[in-house]
Amino acid sequence: MNDRREDSLTMHGRTLRKKSYRIIPLVLSLLLVMSTPISASASTRAVPNENADRWGTGASCPTYPHISGSYETIDRLESVAENEKEFVMKVQAGGHTLELFLTFPDTGGFRLNTNSKGYFEPAGNGKIVYQKSADGKVTMKAEDGTTVIFEQKDSGFRLSVCNGEGKRLFGITPGQIGFSFENGKVIKVRLELPLAEQESIYGSGERFNDYDQVGKRLLMWNVDVGYNRPYSSLADSEMWRGYKNIPILHSNRGYTLFFNSYYSGSTDIGWTDSNKYTMEFQGPDFDFYVWTGTPKENLADYAGLTGTTLVLPKWAFSYIPGQHSSVWNSYGGSMLGTILKMQQGFKELGTPNIAAAYCEGADITDAKIYNALKKTGTRLLTWNPPDHNVNTMKGFLPGVDTLDLPITKSMTNPVSDVGCFVDFTDPLAKTMITNRVGNYARVGWAGGLLDFGELIPLRALFRGNGTTGEEMHNMFPYWVGKVYHEVMDETTVDGGVTFSRAGCAGAQSYTAFFTGDQYTGTYGMSRQLIAGLSGSASGLTMWGADLGGLDGTPSDEMYARSMEFSAFQPIMRAHGTSSRFPWDYGTVGKKTYQKYYWLRENLVDKIYSSNISSSKTGLPLTVALNMEYPNVQEYDGLYTTYIFCDDFLVTPVIEEQSYLYDVTFPTGSWYGLENGEKVEGGETKKVEAPVDFIPVYIKAGAAIPVKIGESLKLADSMQDVDTTEALIVTIPDEERESQFWKDEDTCVTYTSTRVDDSTFAINAGEGNDAIAVILKGSASYGVTVDGTKLERLYSQPISKGQAGYYCRDNGQTIINIGNNDWKQIEISLGEFKLENLMKDATVNNEKLQTTIDGDYETIYAISTKESEQDLIYELKKATAVETIKVKWTSVYAEKYKVSISSDGNNWKEVLNEEEGYGGIKVIDAEAENVKYIKIHDVERKTGIIPVLYEVEAYGAADEEHVSGNLVQQLENFLWDVLHGDLEKSYVIIIFSIAVLTIAVSAIVIVVLRKKKQNKMHATKEE
């Protein structure tokens, strides 16, 4: 077995994964066409016509089937039965009798179904309490408050659905339910619901057209969507296709509907009629659930029914490089050569220990690959096809007869194979996969991509569970993921992970996902964002897009933007048909990679914790604003900003040449992850977004566990240094509790509480490991740990250095506690009086005024002539300068210098930039008596005009510049006196005496005035 090389689909096809090459689908299509044709007699149920592609998919996989036949709506209610746990309506439709069962499942909401039910069943149903009114209405109520009111109307009926607050959400009448019959059996079902004005509908699986689906029609039939083409070829496309179609719809009217069917179907959400939406499925199952809570509550109930997300191994949340097999085989001359070249490249960037690499096309039997990857602790992820030819399968299952192999058969000819697809419902499939990967899982194989899960033809027969392709076409990803998940659990050393392109309801319990195939550039990136959020709203929690897009080569700028975006996805993974190695994307590619590689490593514990929480609650890691804030109508359809891991407000920059970007801030206080900027929410604000910066803000009251290096700085290298457990915290608007799952059984609780207007406390529960705290959004005037006051430090602390707190501006305070035994930290908030020294500066070129006017939208382009001149800023007076910020738009100078002077003649160079890549360059000047600042020796690239939008300078943030309230000042004064530190307290003593004198004088004046008023009042009475 060790020398057997795998083959799948075709021997050559195994190296060509993506549809840009179209070889694999073509071969499969030929196989499907050559399969035994279906013959249907009058005694069999209707068979879909695979050639009737009324949707015009043009996809290289089985076309959308079509079953002809008209619908019969319910024309008569015959009887009702009020049973203990179900309300039964016997109805007539087109001369056929059916029963509709209304129940209240223990997963919440209500369910309406016929005798033909879908795959998912609740553990039980609640007891129904019936309330009858004088006019004959029957009210039924669930434990979660969902209420259904039945009233008979002549020979018909009406069901009114209300939420727990008694608000009517929608109604169902006989004309909204349709069945199509053949030979007395149901062959198609339909449900119509009203569509209100300004109603927003979202979910429906992973989408690429838009986040809000009102006005659109959607195909509920998994296909290879073919959206990995340039935008120009998609501009007029309806884009209704999807790899992961899930019939779950959220309405902003306050409910969620899930149609429990895997059969082929479609939804028409105001496409044909703006007053209604229609769900149609080509199978006998009429079965849907409705939940009436908030969108997140409803999604949790849906997960309770279909399954919560799986927990990935922690290493899977680190950056995972990958690319197309053609790149792996050519970039370094061979697969092994490219792996060695990759390892050298990451070593040079200071990140040698890559957790895992997706090596598409790698031979999993090649010991040389494992030996090479073992040196850097890198796990091997590979491409895993949905099919194997007979000879390959027999090699994995020695002794098994050909007819007994777990291969899908023809539903009309049990001995005829259909496409060599693995029948993953057959127990032998697990044995086969175990024999394929088991030995290699013990030496470094850890999963990879599950691809082409959309190719199951209708005629396929799955003998393992007796289903056919009609139902299994959409359900196939569930079974593939399940088998691989079980095999990896049993064979891998420290867990495995698979990423499926196809998806369906329930698959989230067994596999993670990648967002299909997109083209590079801004348009493809926007589709990735829509796909991730719509998929998350449909229960597909663990996802990661192809960093940089699949087809094409992104610009250096868009590679950087994609790197930033990927760092705030559940899974950070790269893939593409050209190199996705950061060193191939210029200085900006390398620098952005290094920054966000380490920032991601800082956040791995937090993301892993969120994954565990999701597995317990069913809530996704990425949440669109309309799910998080469902009562804000402005968020309907908005996808550009989202919540990540409950605490981060993320706005990926998906426009080229942007240095400013609009961020939508929900109500409440938000604090910049990078700069500590405080923003009061409730509006959309334009913020700085230089090329290496993604706008990420932290929710008020957050307590976020992070792992950081000795420097106690985020995004700093942690290579070959001791790491430290820390917390990122923000000031709470109100009391807030945060849970940190260290593993699936261990949870630490942090509570943030306001003590008063200028003080807040963080309480840590059992299991706390944090020995440092990073406060975002404020300087601090004082910090106490379990009642003991910490000293203020005047230089950046390190993890093993002196305990204390340090702040140099109003954006951040670093607190080094020194141990993890603490229970409470109390932080008194302070504020430095820092002003931009450039505000009153003069310039040697009138045009330069735009760089110091405080308006980030005014710019200064350095022309050919001006690049030869010095850009000189004269401060209002000579002063100490701590930092200088040079801010470039997306068009920047790669080489330039910055110098300072006290007299304009003698200059000291404080920056010699040789590898500039734009963005905000922060220069630590740390100089006294600065009167002039000069930018000079600007080198322009051919055809590029560098553009500045602002230049700023700030003085030192000395102790005298930080202030708190009067009580804090007195507390600090007493502390210094008691500890004999009077030298540092002279200023405070003088200030405090002055304040006390003023206060006493004010009190005396008030008392005397009161006495005078009382005396006058007494005289008047006399």
Spans of model-derived segments:
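Sec-dependent signal peptide cleavage junction
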Residues: M34-R45, L1008-K1011
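Catalytic and substrate-binding clefts that recognize carbohydrates or anionic sugar/phosphate headgroups
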Residues: A46-G58, Q92-G94, F101-F104, A123-N125, ...
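Aromatic- and carboxylate-enriched substrate-binding clefts and catalytic-loop regions
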Residues: S180, G350-Y593, N626-V632, L638, ...
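Catalytic core of carbohydrate-active enzymes
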Residues: E486-V487, G495-G496, G503-F513, A531, ...
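Extended extracellular/luminal ectodomain segments enriched in beta-structured repeat modules
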Residues: G767-A770, S867-E868, K876-T883, V930
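Disordered, acidic Ser/Thr/Pro-rich linker "stalks" and the adjacent N-terminal cap
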Residues: F832-K877, K887-Y892, E913, G919, ...
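Trp- and acidic/polar-enriched beta-sheet ligand-binding modules for extracellular glycan
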Residues: K865-Q869, S890-A957
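C-terminal membrane-anchoring or membrane-association module
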Residues: A999-E1022
